[in-house]
């Protein structure tokens, strides 16, 4: 009975150790527009121009309403560098002597001198350079129109490969004036942008600590 219980416990621990989770997403809002209730059709007054169905005649069809789509051209390059140096030095000296004192018990110590010197130096230099590049396209959906006319957009692209699935997610706020021809906008023009690339491949899962390891490190930090 005890042997069976020990084997079961060992199997449970091995299963927990093998469990790994993919990194959490930074895109918290929905990545697509929710179905909208049909808008009430306003009564027509017989005029050719109707504000509810207005579309500019001499410009491309661009995203304006909830549910419209536009393409974000991702072209992100970041680079950061840091250099630091420090140095310190310290020197100390001691010089002492015993003169001729007639009442000194031991005559052998008369004229004794002590001379000591000590020095210490410290110097440290460090340099850090990091660069990242992220390019691609992802089509997003307008999920909300703010009172000032700006568009809250979000979208996700999934690419299934032999060894896993790649996820590209994006969310942010787009100003309609920055939308270019072809209904595209540069990622540099997206406010509050959250752009991420994730993968469910085994290589990426190996970088995520399993559940059991995170449990023990929660109260036994390295």
From Swiss-Prot:
Record InterPro entries: Flag_Lring
Entry keyword set: Bacterial flagellum, Cell outer membrane, Lipoprotein, Membrane, Palmitate, Signal
Signal peptide (UniProt feature, chain positions): 1-18
GO BP terms, alphabetized: bacterial-type flagellum-dependent cell motility
Pfam entry (one): FlgH
Topological type in the membrane: Lipid-anchor
Lipid tethering residues (N-palmitoyl cysteine): 19
Any GO CC annotation of this UniProt entry: bacterial-type flagellum basal body, distal rod, L ring
Database matches in PROSITE patterns: PROKAR_LIPOPROTEIN
Domain of life: Bacteria
Compartment(s) where it occurs, according to its Swiss-Prot or TrEMBL record: Cell outer membrane; Bacterial flagellum basal body
Described purpose of this protein according to its UniProt entry: Assembles around the rod to form the L-ring and probably protects the motor/basal body from shearing forces during rotation.
PANTHER family to which the protein is assigned, alphabetical: FLAGELLAR L-RING PROTEIN (PTHR34933:SF3)
Subunit-structure text: The basal body constitutes a major portion of the flagellar organelle and consists of four rings (L,P,S, and M) mounted on a central rod.
Family the UniProt entry places it in: Belongs to the FlgH family.
Name by which UniProt lists this protein: Flagellar L-ring protein
């Amino acid at each position: 009975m005890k042997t069976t219980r020990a084997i079961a416990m060992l199997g449970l621990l091995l299963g927990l150790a093998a469990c790994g989770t993919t990194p959490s997403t930074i895109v918290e809002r929905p990545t697509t527009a929710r179905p909208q209730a049909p808008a009430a059709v306003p009564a027509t007054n017989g005029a050719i121009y109707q504000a509810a169905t207005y579309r500019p005649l001499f410009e491309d069809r661009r995203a304006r309403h909830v549910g419209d789509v536009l393409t974000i051209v991702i072209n992100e390059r970041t680079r950061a560098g840091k250099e630091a140096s420090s140095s310190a030095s310290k020197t100390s000296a001691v010089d002492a002597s015993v003169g001729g004192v007639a009442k000194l018990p031991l005559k052998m110590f008369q004229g004794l001198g002590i001379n000591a010197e000590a020095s210490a130096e410290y110097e440290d230099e460090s340099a850090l350079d990091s660069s990242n590049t992220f390019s691609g396209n992802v089509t997003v959906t307008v999920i909300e129109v703010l009172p000032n006319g700006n568009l809250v957009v979000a979208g996700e692209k999934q690419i299934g490969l032999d060894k896993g699935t790649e996820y590209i997610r994006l969310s942010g706020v787009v100003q309609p004036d920055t939308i270019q021809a072809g209904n595209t906008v540069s990622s540099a023009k997206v406010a509050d942008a959250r752009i991420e690339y994730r993968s469910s491949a085994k290589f990426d899962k190996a970088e995520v600590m399993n559940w059991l390891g995170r449990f023990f490190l929660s109260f036994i930090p390295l």
